[in-house]
From Swiss-Prot:
One term under GO cellular component: cytosol
Role summary: Involved in mRNA degradation. Catalyzes the phosphorolysis of single-stranded polyribonucleotides processively in the 3'- to 5'-direction.
Statement: the UniProt record of this protein carries the keyword Flavoprotein: no
Main location: cytoplasm
UniProt keyword annotations, A-Z: Cytoplasm, Magnesium, Metal-binding, Nucleotidyltransferase, RNA-binding, Transferase
Intrachain disulfide bonds: none
Name of the protein in its database record: Polyribonucleotide nucleotidyltransferase
């Protein structure tokens, strides 16, 4: 296929798609140019079905540092493991694409997005999401798309699609919404306490823009799309399915209705073991033994899936006996740990999270050096999910994509209420340890994080609570669930997480397993989540009503002063000489950022105060009109030089010493003498002129009678 180019203007920028020139051996590939951002997307599919019991989809988002004209860090000077932002972007693309493959599809699919050039004012992640959908859609991979995604900002009451970096900085909303032509199927958002009404409007505005991009993709698919390949889907033997349902469904239904999680798991597992044992014995010598046993396992999974959904939609009974809008029992506790800077333990049913706060100087802030300009990240929220939290063994090691994603969601929810750096000059780290899990552990970590921050004396603007909403839909009727547990998440159609304060929403995240949900469902879920959020906030308030007025005794003491940017070099000195001398004299630790924020850290408040005085004197500047108690340091015929403070001298001209004529400066002043002077002028070279006579009363003018003519 020869090179073909398609263009449109989207959100004020040119969107260009090129195909047929590069990566032609992939099942589908496109180059997407949006503004000056360029992303190559290649989609490939294995020829055979995988043997696992899940769809092996892998989505990568690879940031090449050359895209921003930068060298990679590190000794090897080449890209290593994906950054946190790249990992989150890969998840962002994966989530709306995954539901668009047929049930039972098991061929391995890889979608690789490579950022080739980067423009911070033209979203490379959204170009990659567009490219991922389009590469799949024009390929022979059986993808039921297209989908698309956009970013939405909210500035001065107006919604902006795919904002520039400057617009996003001014925005009260950072929203990514994706979906099909018919409905939304993925949401990721942080917000500055916005109402449910504004959030819903933002979602709908975003979906309108998504539909524009999908229409563009459909034009391209019509022009160059390949015929879809015929692939084998995982389908069970219908006769075997009917037989197992007839003989074992009643027992499985009873097991599913056991209310306590571990007991329910044991009961369902016992039923499954009986069925599997029966068919293992019957077909042990059969030539298709592996396929039959795979079908048996899949049928049992489908039976459990169907029963959970039937109970909720028809009988309005949840697996643990709750109403559809009922939250599990709640408990909140602070000060679970000694010595640490703050801790909170939050329990919701069989989900429990411990959050631990650590405060440090800004020098400990994380340096982010990606495609965007380097910056310091002050607040970190890390989420850990050990396997013992669900009573299982498993892999232990570096955080995976899920843990990174859940940590980022909690970070977005809580950072909206943090005090400014000027109000609270600390780097802040929260670590959420999930101790038990039966669904909604990410939202439990947000609640525990609120407790830890308040217990640690961080003056947050308001407490934040989170809740996870679910959905069971048969295409015609639906039920929205409050506070979903693990089984409802696993067998349900939606996981919609909402976090916020009493004033509004601070974070949203939605993933669905069906192709999309309607505005009506979104509105109902948001309203139900608000009611639940307020109920949880009441429990948090019962544990701690407001942030403590002081930090923990173990927390570091930090103070901050602001200096002019051009004074940074004065405080640091040549080769760091000045700042090293201050540190040696006072024993403090000092961090200075490029904006002139000076953080002083010590366990001794007196040392901090002494350091502030030293720095203040170093950066002090004379000001016209101010009066100083100065010392004469040099005498010349034309006047005297006086030291105002530190290394700042001023000239008192001979005419500014007194109102009467001064014949000889040395007759009036001597070196070492202390005098009061007023600054009357500072020239463009920084030279200071001062006056003594300006502080003296002006003598009356002598009478000067007119001469007679």
């Amino acid at each position: 296929m020869s090179k073909q180019v398609f263009e449109m203007i989207f959100a004020g920028k040119k969107l260009v798609v090129e195909t047929g020139q590069v990566a032609k051996q992939a099942n589908g590939s496109v180059v997407v140019r949006y503004g000056d951002s360029t992303v190559l997307t290649a989609a490939v599919m294995s020829k055979k079905m995988s043997t696992g019991d899940f769809f092996p989809l892998q989505v990568n988002y690879e940031e090449k540092m050359y895209a921003a004209g930068k060298f990679p860090g590190g000794f090897n000077k080449r890209e290593g493991r994906p950054s946190t932002d790249a990992t989150l972007t890969a998840r962002l693309i994966d989530r709306p694409i995954r539901p668009m493959f047929a049930e039972g599809f098991r061929n391995e699919v890889q979608v690789i997005n490579t950022v080739l050039s980067f423009d911070e004012n033209a979203s490379a992640p959204m170009a990659a999401m567009f490219g991922s959908s389009l590469a799949l859609s024009i390929s022979d991979i059986p993808f039921n798309g297209p989908i698309a995604g956009v970013q939405v900002a909210y500035v001065d009451g107006n919604f902006i699609i795919n904002p520039t970096a400057q617009e996003q900085e001014a925005s009260a909303l950072e929203l990514t919404v994706a979906g099909t032509k018919e409905a939304i199927n993925m949401v990721e958002s942080g917000a500055k306490e916005l109402s449910e009404e504004i959030m819903l409007e933002a979602l709908l505005k975003g979906h309108e823009a998504v539909c524009e991009l999908i229409a563009f993709q459909e034009e391209i698919v019509t022009a160059i799309g390949k015929e879809k390949a015929e692939v084998e889907l995982l389908q069970v033997d219908p006769e075997l399915q009917a037989e197992i349902i007839a003989t074992h469904n009643i027992a499985l239904q009873a097991a599913v209705q056991v209310e306590e999680k571990k007991a329910r798991e044991a009961a369902t597992e016992a039923v499954k073991e009986v069925v599997i044992g029966e068919y293992e014995a019957r077909y042990a010598e059969h030539e298709e033994y592996d396929r039959i046993m795979r079908d048996v396992a899949e049928i049992l999974e489908q039976m459990e899936h169907a029963e959970v959904r039937r109970l909720i939609t028809e009988d309005k009974i949840r697996p643990d006996g709750r109403r559809v809008d009922e939250i599990r029992p709640l408990d909140a506790e602070i000060d679970f740990l000694p010595q640490v800077h703050g801790s909170g333990l939050f329990t919701r049913g069989q989900t429990q999270a411990l959050s631990v706060l650590t405060l440090a100087p800004m020098g400990e802030a994380q340096i982010i050096d990606g495609l965007t300009p380097e910056y310091k990240k002050r607040f970190m929220h890390h989420y850990n999910f050990p396997q013992y939290s669900v009573g299982e063994t498993g892999r232990y090691g570096a955080a995976g994509r899920r843990e990174i994603g859940h940590g980022a969601l909690g970070e977005r929810a809580l950072e909206q209420v943090l005090p400014s750096l000027e109000e609270f000059p600390y780097a802040i780290r929260l670590v959420a340890e999930v101790l038990e899990s039966n669904g909604s552990s990410s939202q439990a970590s947000i609640c525990a994080g609120t407790l830890a921050l308040m217990a640690g004396g961080v003056p947050i603007k308001a407490p934040v609570a989170g809740i996870a909403m679910g959905l069971i839909s048969d295409g015609t009727n639906y039920t929205v669930l409050t506070d979903i547990q693990g089984l409802e998440d696993h067998f349900g159609d939606m996981d919609f997480k909402v976090a916020g304060t009493r004033e509004g929403i601070t974070a949203l995240q939605m993933d669905i397993k069906i192709e999309g949900i309607t505005p009506q469902i979104l509105e109902e879920a948001l309203a139900q989540a608000k009611k639940a959020r307020f109920e949880i906030l009441d429990v948090l308030h019962g544990a701690i009503a407001e942030p403590r007025p002081q930090l923990a005794p173990t927390a570091p003491k930090i103070d901050m002063i602001k200096i002019d940017v051009d004074k940074i070099k004065v405080v640091i000195g040549k080769g760091g000489e000045t700042i090293d001398k201050i540190i040696a004299e006072t024993g403090v630790k000092i961090d200075i950022d490029e904006e002139g924020n000076v953080s002083i850290f010590s366990s001794d408040q007196a040392a901090i105060d002494r350091t502030k005085d030293i720095i203040a004197s170093l950066v002090r500047e004379a000001k016209v009109g101010e009066v100083y108690h100065a010392k004469v340091v040099r005498i010349e015929k034309f006047g005297a030089f006086v030291n105002l403070f530190d290394k700042t001298d001023a000239l008192v001209h001979i005419s500014e010493i007194a109102w009467t004529r001064t014949a000889n400066v040395a007759d009036v002043l001597e070196i070492g003498e202390e005098v009061d002077v007023k600054v009357i002028k500072i020239d463009d070279k920084g030279r200071v002129d001062a006056s003594m006579k300006a502080l003296l009363p002006r003598p009356p003018k002598a009478d000067n009678p007119k001469k007679e003519s």
